[in-house]
Amino acid sequence: MLLTPSFELPPRAARTLISLCLSWAFCQSSVGLAQGKSDPSSGAVAAAVRDGAHDFDFGAGTWHTHIKRTLDPFDDKSPSMELDGSVSSRKVWGGRAWLEEIQADGPKGHWQAMTLFLYNPQAHQWSMNFINSKMGTLNSPLIGEFKDGHGDLFQQDTFKDRAILVRGRWSNITADAHTYEESYSDDGGKTWKTAFMARKTRVPASEIRPVQETPNDFDFHVGTWKLHTARLLKPLSGATQWTEADGTVVFKKIWDGSANLSEIHTDYPTGAVDFLALRWYNPVARQWFLSFATAADGQLGTAMAGQFKDGRIDFYDQEPFNGKAILVRFSMWHGAKGQPVSEQAFSADGGKTWETNFRTDYTRVSSN
């Protein structure tokens, strides 16, 4: 049994079963999300903890961005490059998550990226998850919070083979402008060197141009769908008892179709479950990747990879399950009536045999 009545998230493979099978748009099975917890030692302190779930509300809309990037922030003589472009930001989960699409032009041509901001209600912190369209890889998140009118998120990284700290800061926030600055520190945060500066000004609604859409692998799935799931209660145990549930999926394009985000809501007898599924294409590997987040802990899990062949896509991953390493396969295709179907299976013998433990059927509600 991987889905507990209280909906506490079980181990990685257990969360995989919950998430992957709730939506055809969701193929993540490698989770292990760190869950922050507030300090219960003082009722007064806990009561005073600030709810930052709407910290990024200022970013809603479309913005012009002017970017300056310093190639080596630790070298005072380092060259820099400048880019101009646009940023479109919209809220998800009523503001507990935000999706930011970025495109800009500079000396090296056109550049696209996206950022998914997720709020952790236990830790009262935000995570910033960034993907560059040219590389198609998900960076480790910056994590932090807003205080005194600005937001600081931090991450440990390497620069020229040296360990550094990275700080992302939002400041100078008004209704029509704000600044994002990314700085590096090689002395434990005593001093910071600016590596990236983006100054954003709001674009009036009358000047916003519609995005030109292009065909991609998942264009058919754009829209709203009803889902019906059937789940095996005890995988890899010889059990044959299944349970069923219904829900909805709202699927939207990003980057004109080379990435997408789906919002998943499923109703179980013991309560509702909400997920986000973020999927993007890696043009170098020619593979699709997908990761998910739950409303409970507001962090993205590790992504699976897969690719289409003959109208079907199969994603594979290795996961711990009941103390043993297993293989997880998640597949998507079109059924007899042309509607999407997804299926998850586990293998305990290295892929020689597979046991299906989840199936989802979808019915279109609307195409937008």
Regions found by a protein language model. Name each.
Residues 1-12:
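N-terminal secretory signal peptides that target proteins for export/translocation
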Residues 16-28:
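Bacterial N-terminal signal peptides
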Residues 30-34:
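Sec/Tat signal peptide C-region and signal peptidase I cleavage site
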Residues 35-368:
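Hydrophobic small-molecule pocket/channel-lining residues, especially in calycin-type beta-barrels
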